[in-house]
């Protein structure tokens, strides 16, 4: 997969970030991951100059052979999108990790620009707030909902608790203080 330098990434007028939604025990993408990748592929067709960042290692459980990010990238390429446009962030295991690692690896070194954040409908509020807390107000972030997955209703029940955990984790850290966020994430993951 292409690991563009920030200088190459900065040429893209817009960025699409798609968040993984889990992997099944056999190592295949969960329905939420597939739906999110489909939505990202659809969005990419109408934003021909945007760079795409697929974010996610895996959620709970053992690490599969292929990350959520790599699996989503493969699906997006199968939908006709050039692989050279796709970047991977494959360390994160949750939404805070998505925001911190995407920012640390790719976004911190480039000027702010419009960004589309693709995730499940139930996950939009928390993911948008998390990325805004990490990146700060200079970044114009728009949420894009994928089609719902069969387990979205069950997963949505946990969102208020996860949002409180996110706010607590990032409390006292200013947007853009990525090194502090990375250090805190490595020291005490929010899970």
How does the language model describe each region?
Residues 1-159:
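A structural signal for short, hydrophobic/glycine-enriched beta-strand patches
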Residues 150-191:
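C-terminal capping/extension of enzyme domains
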């Amino acid at each position: 997969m292409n690991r563009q330098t920030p200088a190459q990434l900065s040429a893209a007028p817009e960025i699409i970030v798609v968040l993984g939604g889990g992997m099944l025990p056999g190592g295949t993408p969960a329905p939420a991951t597939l739906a999110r990748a489909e939505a990202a592929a659809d969005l990419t067709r109408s934003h021909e100059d945007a760079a795409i960042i697929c974010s996610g290692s895996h959620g709970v459980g053992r690490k599969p052979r292929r990350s959520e990010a790599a699996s989503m990238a493969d699906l997006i390429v199968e939908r006709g999108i050039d692989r050279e446009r796709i970047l991977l962030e494959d360390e994160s295991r949750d939404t805070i990790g998505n925001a911190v690692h995407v920012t640390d690896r790719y976004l911190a070194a480039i000027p702010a620009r419009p960004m589309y954040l693709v995730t499940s409908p139930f996950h939009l509020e928390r993911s948008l707030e998390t990325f805004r807390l990490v990146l700060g107000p200079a970044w114009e972030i728009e949420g894009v909902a994928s089609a719902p997955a069969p387990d979205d209703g069950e997963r949505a029940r946990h969102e208020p608790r996860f949002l409180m955990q996110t706010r607590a984790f990032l409390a006292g850290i200013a947007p853009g203080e990525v090194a502090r966020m990375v250090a805190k994430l490595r020291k005490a993951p929010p899970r």
